[in-house]
Amino acid sequence: NGIQKLKPGTYMTIDSERNIQENTYWRPNAKRPVGNVSEEEYIERTHELLTAAVTKRMNASDVPIGVLLSGGLDSSLIVALLKEAGHERIRTFSIGFEDIDDEAGSEFEYSDQIVSRFDTEHKKYKVSNQEVLPRLSEAVMNMAEPMVGQDAVAFYLLSEQVSKHTKVVLSDRKSTRL
């Protein structure tokens, strides 16, 4: 269909004669530290940076914040870091679909474990298979950028429900304002 996503740190200009030019405005300055750094030091520094990032986002909002919890590694880590940083009242939200044949439609069994372990205020939303297809075009029209897969519709439907309870959520995608 000719629509493609630009590379990170670039912008595109198109002149009146339809000449296209892609330009880079930013490149990450990623350099390895000088000297020998142990695996333990990398782990400690990564933990510090992740904790700082999550805490910064929690403290930057003047409204209650939630977490979109799939039960996967990334969203579970966000919940764990929030709890570790002293946030007692963590709101979490999960979505699931009906099972089809042998394929599980929800990952509630995983998110439930995180909810139990970290004692979050949790809401689950189960979407019927009949609801997904009619909402697909609406979900695509409201996306900031093209996404493919069942989770694209899931993210949209979950966001619709979550927005009734909070306006800012953290997710494994990025911090999102609903």
How should each PLM-predicted stretch be described?
Residues 16, 29-178:
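ATP-dependent adenylate-handling active sites, centered on carboxylate activation for C-N bond formation
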Residues 1-40:
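N-terminal segments that mediate ammonia production and transfer
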